[in-house]
Amino acid sequence: MKSLKIVLLVLLIQTNIFSQQSPKREMRAAWISTVDNIDWPSKPGLSDKEMKAEMIAILDNLRSYNLNTVVFQVRPTADAYYKSTKEPASHWITGTQGVAPGFDPLQLMIDEAGKRGMNVHVWLNPYRVQKDTTKEVLSKNHLFFKKPELFLTYGKSRYFNPGYKETRDFVSSVVGEIVRNYDVQAIHMDDYFYPYKIAGQEFPDEAAFAKEPRQFKDKDDWRRDNVDLIIKQIRDTIIANKPEVEFGISPFGVWRNIAKDSDGSKTVAGATNYDDLYANILKWQKENWIDYVTPQLYWHIGFDRANFEVLAKWWAAHKFGANVYIGHGDYKISNTAKEPEWRSADQIVKQIEMIRNMPQIDGSMHFTANNFLKKGDTLRKPLMDKEYKFIALTPEANRITRIKALPPTNAVALKKGGSGILTWKAGLNDKKFVIYRFPKGKITDFSNAENIYYVTTATKLEVPNPNFENYIYAISALSQTQTESSPIAFTTK
């Protein structure tokens, strides 16, 4: 047997986030929507075996695109896709709210995504309770029946009343339960704060405004403050429990139109975060309440009312220290799309190429996961030919104290039949491991994403056709904050 001495490779691990060809650090995420069974499970009432198989198929598919993060919706309507003492299991799982499956969906997602080197961001909707009160039946144990005064109905939907402190306290406690009990990368919320306005209907929060005005005279300012307060409280809850967990928001793509605010974007959007959803995203970024923002830019490049390029540049210029990822509307791709720009995946490819030329932008999130499954080669070939050809690590959070990972130890490469078995032991703070592969005799460049072979939470990896005679394998570790350790080489036996 040939034995090589393990050598600590004292090389600077650099990121190349601005490289058009293959950035080593880049967010590549997909939303996994559970509301209305958009992505998972495909319908209520499947067997545990069927639901698990569907989840694993989704993750395998996303991993095949070299995505590195999933944003899993675990609380679409004041319900739970995890073990909760506060809210009932979602009716979109079993068909009946309060009836849980025989496994923990969030834990399975964390375990299976981790094996494939992907992080899990946990996606919650803060206020929504029922999308349609005429169709959705609440569990008898739902908070609604204990505290009906905390809720209101707008259109066909039911919501927590954002105006009450008790609402903020409860939603924050839900976040605390998740952060304490699960090893997640981030807490994530989207654009649904106050609901999108219904023409001719006023949101019925007058009683809350009268009861808890907090010295506000203007209701719109009060509403924005309600959302500010819950964002700040959620941030504080995360820090009190696990300060290394990130908090991200994916808002509607337009903060304000320039016609209303000189700081706004050159857009003519029919709704905006600030004026309609009462979500003052820029304030949250400036106050360090959130770690990243992912504006939903679901318009094409050149769209007259909300141009993707204009908005990407606007958000890049308004990051205020938070990471900025761009939300892409992959769901719009169709050969029968009304807008010709969406009749192929070229639009998504062009958007990715465009934002890679904006150094303030740190990657992408794609809506939604099922598009990677259903669109097949329509999406796969354009992305895998170039943009996502190589694996990328997720960016480090700018606002969280970085945790140092120690290099793995006892890294051994063993040939077994036609395969290679790589094994190692985790060091302190190690959450994931990055396997590199280099041709012998060439410079071992750890800054080049082309040399990343695999990422996983496991401490063992089978490598088909390892070709140990011509390749060197090495390994580093990633901490919770995605901070990379020094690498070491595998000893070949």
What spans do the regions from the language model cover?
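Active-site-adjacent "subsite" loops/lids of carbohydrate-active enzymes
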Residues: 33-52, 122, 127-181, 275-279
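Catalytic domains of carbohydrate-active enzymes, especially glycoside hydrolases
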Residues: 53-79, 181-185, 283
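Aromatic-lined carbohydrate-binding/catalytic grooves of carbohydrate-active enzymes
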Residues: 63-101
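Aromatic- and acidic-residue-enriched segments that line the glycan-binding/catalytic groove
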Residues: 80-94, 128-154, 191-214, 259-271
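Active-site neighborhood of glycoside hydrolase catalytic domains
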Residues: 166-174, 180-189, 193-267, 271-292, ...
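Substrate-binding cleft of secreted/luminal carbohydrate-active enzymes
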Residues: 278-304, 320-399
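Pro/Thr/Ser/Gly-rich low-complexity, intrinsically disordered linker/stalk tracts
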Residues: 379, 383-429, 482-493
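Beta-strand-rich modules
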Residues: 463-484
